[in-house]
Curated annotation (Swiss-Prot):
GO terms for cellular component: plasma membrane. Pathway: Cell wall biogenesis; lipoteichoic acid biosynthesis. GO terms for biological process: lipid transport; lipoteichoic acid biosynthetic process. GO terms for molecular function: antiporter activity. It comes from the Bacteria. Proton-coupled antiporter flippase that catalyzes the translocation, from the inner to the outer leaflet of the cell membrane, of the lipid-linked disaccharide (anchor-LLD) that anchors lipoteichoic acids (LTA) to the cell membrane. The chain crosses the membrane at residues 15-34, 46-73, 80-99, 105-126, 138-159, 165-184, 211-231, 243-263, 275-294, 300-320, 340-363, 369-389. Its main location: membrane. Keywords: Antiport, Cell membrane, Lipid transport, Membrane, Transmembrane, Transmembrane helix, Transport, Virulence. The keyword Chaperone does not apply. This is Proton-coupled antiporter flippase LtaA. It comes from Staphylococcus haemolyticus (strain JCSC1435). It is a multi-pass membrane protein.
Length: 398
């Protein structure tokens, strides 16, 4: 079978299938987590507290699994771990068919789905070719974003036709991804059977060696997710738009991000490290300005314009940032390291909505959440701007 990375001539068949599998798993996640669970309180007797708990626990289980999944992949092999992952995802969404509004099932399914999607991510990130990392990262994150958004939109249509009748579609998507898995050949960097104590020590060692990356990994997710609890209220109460116009703004931002990931991210591979550093620093500065600007905007047309610029910038910032992270990773520990990185990123995405919601509630103002989010990106710009200058200064001396 072809190697699961890009060849010199383009994307291998193996890598294409893996991208489709990632897309389908995120499609299923978008259907369930972003659409189905959020829609339940509006059409059934299930409480908002239950669905909120399901969402939080889903991301907690995802982050916790990411922390150890790299070690599990190397200890037990990809075939066993991925097969169990697909089985767990299928069971989680199959239960929803029979118990569509049962609170225990809703929460349990969210936990199982969070665990199930983790190994796909780690394998995709660790199988990317170094020479074309920016381009390949663009494809990986495009598959992720497109899967989530299309799954969310598709399920929104289905639940409007009937709240629960089409729940079977979610497990069907997982089955398709599962079948496709048997057409790929996945190879890890190496296999080992280290004892648990040694693996825990390796996790600590990974964290110590990559401390400089942790502020960016943790705080980017926290800054962006902090806006999630207040964006719907901001759109309807401050800007005064309908749900459809708000959805269009999200779609415009997503389209800009997708375009940038597909067509602009590849320029990272064709330029120097200095260019990559400039993209990251400029991205943080522009995010600071754009997010702060949203607190001043009350016109939907301007919101749409800002949304597309945010999407375009994020679509090139994310591959640049991941290329920067990848340059710090020991090639023999890719699966373990990406697992830890994804776990830290997931933790940031968990605490962001908590801080964003609390700031808006206790300060009695949505703008303060925007200021909080913008301030985080400003801190990141200063921190990494100083780091990049010092790093280039050291490099020039040798």
């Amino acid at each position: 079978m072809p190697d699961s990375s890009l060849s010199n001539k383009g994307i291998s068949k193996n890598f294409k299938i893996m991208l489709v599998i990632l897309f389908l798993m995120e499609f299923a996640r978008g259907m369930y987590v972003l659409s189905y669970v959020n829609y339940l309180p509006t059409v059934t007797s299930i409480a908002v507290a239950v669905t909120s708990a399901a969402l939080s626990i889903h991301f907690i289980s995802d982050a916790a699994t990411n922390f150890v999944i790299g070690f599990l992949l190397k200890k037990f092999g990809t075939k066993l771990v991925l097969t169990l992952g697909f089985l767990l995802a299928f069971i989680s969404l199959f239960l929803v068919i029979w118990f569509p509004t049962n609170p225990i099932v809703i929460i349990l399914s969210a936990i199982m789905l969070g665990i199930a999607v983790s190994p796909i991510w780690v394998i995709m990130l660790s199988s990317v070719e170094e020479a074309q990392r920016g381009k390949q990262m663009g494809y990986v994150y495009f598959a992720w974003l497109l899967g989530l958004l299309v799954g969310w939109a598709f399920m929104n249509v289905l639940v409007k036709l009937h709240p629960t009748r089409f729940a079977f579609m979610m497990s069907l998507v997982v089955v398709i991804a599962w079948v496709l898995y048997y057409f790929v050949d996945i190879k890890l960097t190496n296999y080992n059977t280290k004892p648990v104590s040694e693996q825990l020590g390796q996790i600590v060692d990974v964290m110590k060696r990559h401390l400089v990356l942790f502020p960016g990994i943790l705080l980017q997710g926290a800054s962006i997710s902090a806006l999630l609890p207040i964006l719907p209220t901001y759109a309807t109460k401050v800007v005064g738009v309908s749900t459809i116009e708000y959805t269009i703004a999200i779609a415009i931002g997503g389209a800009g991000c997708a375009f940038s990931m597909l067509f602009l991210s590849k320029i990272i591979d064709k330029n120097s490290k200095g260019f990559m550093y400039a993209v990251i620093f400029t991205g943080f500065i522009l995010f600071t300005a754009f997010i702060f600007g949203l607190s001043l905007v009350t016109n939907i047309l301007i919101v749409w314009i800002v949304a597309i610029f945010i999407g375009l910038m994020y679509g090139i910032l994310l591959p640049a940032w991941n290329t920067f992270m990848a340059g710090q990773i020991d090639p023999a520990e890719q699966e373990e390291t990406w697992g830890v990185f994804n776990s830290v990123q997931g933790f940031g995405s968990m605490i962001g909505p908590l801080f964003g919601g609390l700031i808006a509630q206790f300060s009695n103002g949505l703008n303060n959440t925007f200021y909080f989010s913008a301030a985080i990106f400003l801190v990141l710009a200063i921190f990494y701007g100083v780091y990049f200058v010092k790093y280039r200064g050291k490099a020039n001396r040798f």
